[in-house]
A protein has these predicted regions:
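C-terminal motif of bacterial Sec signal peptides marking the signal peptidase cleavage site
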Residues: 16-19
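Hydrophobic helical h-region of N-terminal Sec-dependent signal peptides
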Residues: 8-12
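Extracellular mucin-like PTS domains
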Residues: 27-31
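Bacterial N-terminal signal peptides that target proteins for export
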Residues: 1-7
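Bacterial signal peptide processing site
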Residues: 21-23
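Metal-dependent phosphoester/phosphodiester hydrolase catalytic core
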Residues: 38, 42-403
Length: 403
């Protein structure tokens, strides 16, 4: 079987990209452009990476450049987990769990802990845990309730169960905050990867449901209300500060999709004012090199758009470690690069730090170790000077036609 390549050289070439704008108005940043990446101008002598971990998890070294980052989502603890052979064969420096890492859906924390114990007993997961550093965020099913938000009554207890399972020390400051959001910066100057793991559950307001007889896809409309929140005030303030820290590549892990907006299921576009705020926060911080990683959808795809921010937005969705739909995906997504992946798979980012701007080889790899998506991103396209030039980084009209 040949890999399902994205549109020929779609990401490595100069792109023409459909915009990500919604029906809200976003204020333009007054920050002036510079010719140099913000990271180079603000670099401190050293930045600590992840805190220590416990319970047999592997620490993430602070000073080692990351060259292979694997990630995935939607892993049912009671089903076969044959994907781990392919993950371990890829030998990643880090694995990121992007949510729905177990399916608990419960307010009973004894049940929640039992579900985590079932995952811990899986041989493939045990091998990963013993050999590979792991970072994780949650989505609704490991949060505790399908499509849940801020009103879940057991969210504080669920947070404790999450942090306990994923090896976060009992004296960590992460146990004092409301929500599991977290960030690390790894690697030496010039090869620094920032990984920001958002919590899209703990503070999220209710979504707006579409009446059953009016649905053409998922159940959620765009809620045109600037007062609602996805992240909550404290997490927003934290994110703004994190994005000001110097880094050469930034991965923002969101359990739900950031770019795709047509399907009607949970997505950032369901709260369009918050989605615009996300792009604006990146722009205000002058944060270059952002790639979104997402899950939730039970299929894989890469979505690309011009966005309301200063350069194109790339969202790599890997969803279905063992919960993929197992069929051809016909769902419309006019931001999609290439084809969607309906088989169980994981995402793999391979970073080449040799060029002035690193390149990121993006693959979605199935259980047979076949790359069903395979393309390379030149991160120069994720810079302010590129986005503000004549490269269609901001106001393009077509996703299908690279220049």
């Amino acid at each position: 079987m040949q890999p399902r390549y994205a549109i020929a050289a779609l990401l490595i070439a100069t792109l023409s990209i459909t915009g990500c704008t919604t029906n809200t108005e976003t204020q333009t940043s007054t920050t002036q452009a510079t010719d140099q990446p913000v990271a180079a101008a603000q670099a401190p002598e050293a930045i600590a990476a992840a805190e220590p971990v416990i319970n047999g998890f592997q620490p993430l070294p602070a000073d080692k450049a990351l060259t292979k980052i694997a990630f995935g989502s939607c892993l049912h603890q009671s089903r076969l987990q044959t994907i781990w052979d392919a993950v371990l064969a890829a030998d990643p420096d880090l694995f990121i769990f992007a949510g729905d890492n177990v399916y608990a859906d419960t307010e009973d924390m004894a049940v929640m802990r039992g579900v985590y114990s079932e995952l811990a007993a899986k041989p493939g997961f045990s091998k990963l845990k013993a050999t590979t550093p792991i970072l994780a965020t949650w989505d609704d099913h490991d949060y505790g309730v399908n499509d849940g938000g801020k009103d879940f009554p057991q969210k504080a207890k669920s947070q404790k169960a999450f942090l306990d399972f994923w090896g976060v020390p009992t004296d960590s400051s992460r146990r004092d905050r409301e929500g599991i959001y977290h960030a690390v910066i790894v690697g030496p100057e010039g090869q620094r990867t920032q990984i920001i793991l958002l919590d899209t559950r703990y503070h999220r307001d209710d979504l707006e449901r579409i009446p059953q007889d009016q649905r053409t896809g998922g159940p959620y409309a765009e809620k045109d209300d600037p007062s609602v929140t996805m992240l909550g005030d404290r997490q927003w303030a934290w994110l703004a500060e994190e994005l000001k820290k110097p880094a050469d590549l930034r991965l923002i892990v969101s359990s739900i999709q950031v770019v795709a907006n047509e399907h009607g299921w949970e997505r950032w576009a369901a709260l369009p004012w918050e989605r615009d705020k996300l792009f604006q926060t990146i722009e205000d911080a002058r944060a270059e090199g952002v790639i979104f990683l997402s899950g939730d959808r039970h299929h894989g795809e890469v979505s690309v758009c011009g966005g309301t921010g200063p350069y194109m937005s790339v969202d790599v969705t890997s969803s279905g470690l063992n919960q993929a739909r197992g069929r051809t995906i016909t769902e419309e997504n006019h931001h999609r690069a290439g084809e969607a992946v309906g088989d169980n798979h994981f995402g793999l980012l391979t970073i080449d730090w040799t060029p002035e701007y690193p390149t990121v080889h993006i693959q979605l790899i199935d259980e047979q170790q076949r790359a069903q998506f395979d393309d390379t991103l030149d991160t120069k396209k994720l810079t302010f000077t590129y986005g503000e030039g004549d490269h269609h980084g901001r106001h393009s009209q077509s996703v299908a036609n690279p220049e």
